[in-house]
Amino acid sequence: MKMIFKMAWRNIWRSKRRSIITISSIFFAVFFAVFARSFQIGVYNKMIANMVGMYTGYLQIHQNGFWEEQSIDNSFIPDQSVLDLLHDNKDITDFNERLESFALTASDNLTKGAIIMGVNLEKEDGLMDLSPKLISGEFPAHTSSSLLISEGLASYYNMSVGDSLILLGQGYHGASANGIFPVSGILKFPMPNLNDRLVLMPILAAQELYAAPERLTSLVLQIDKPEKLNKLKKYISKKLDLEKYELLDWKSLLPELVQTIQADSAGGVIIIGVLYMIISFGILGTLLMMTAERMREFGILISIGMRKSKLILTLIMESLFMGILASIIGISVVSPVRYYFNRNPIRLEDQAAESIEAFGFEPVIPASLDMDIAMNHAGIVLLIVLICTIYPIVTILRLKPVKAMRT
């Protein structure tokens, strides 16, 4: 076997022109496959970060059954062990306590349903980026009973800072949840479903309104390394009492986004598939050329006693060596390109940019730095190389030494 390795390696460099052509074709295959997929995954990651940062976070903890029946009666008082678990984990940068419910808002002769969200506004600003969305007024103090209302709600009631809004709802276990609250600020959200009906208030005031002291409907976990999400979820699941609590990631919280990505990814897979077809024909073409050039060589080797099985194994080793070498070069060359476009993403312009900016998102297309993309596509290209090697293998099996030496 050692001799076959040596022969395969020396054969590669015996005909440098031929080897360089083969390695170049595989190199470009790896480069373009990784380059194209990196942008596609980069767009998905940016979309996820935008949507998750808009409202849900990457992970949420609720009382078991809350997500199926989102009622304030399914709120909970978090155990100290849960809070300690979240505080002690270095992958969790922070967590937001929320008390969410529904209420009827009213002013003068108008009424409208709204989402009432009691939060720690300082923490929520870190997740939802509230400061740039504040178009009028100021954030209420943590102990205040003032409200932040969305622009759509303010327009509906023709309200401004300093006016009062009536809230009518049902509190914990049927308690009355009514009150008149001053408006301290107005927020403009890019998402219509939030901009038309969201009311934020300090969590202490919300707990008092709904007669739910110390109770929460969700703990929203903030993480700065989304690639560690699955590992973090598994770790917390092992430590959490899953009979009492439920732990949901963004995929469970935003199933529509998952479906959108899956539908778009299917189109991307088709494009990558077409690219692989082109790649396959390119690699096959170089192997056809290599086989035709070496017919006499193969005939001589078989004539002097080399078994066809060893010759085939040598040829497979040659293809693997060239494939691995080309993949390493391809990954090495594409990595700084991916890094550049990750730090300096392609900026969209004109109408495309305006349509994205309308939702409050940055109109950019970044490249993903996920090494799994490079390794997976390098592996696929190597598999294509091995499949294309079937032709020279069949040629050797059918080879007649005398005829081949006359070629």
Language-model regions, residue ranges each:
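Transmembrane alpha-helical interface segments in multi-pass membrane proteins
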Residues: 288, 297-342
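C-terminal membrane-exit region of the final transmembrane helix in multipass inner-membrane proteins
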Residues: 364-407
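Mechanotransmission and gating elements of multispan inner-membrane complexes involved in transport
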Residues: 171-268, 275
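Hydrophobic alpha-helical transmembrane segments of multi-pass inner-membrane transport and secretion
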Residues: 16-43, 262-297, 320-332, 379-387
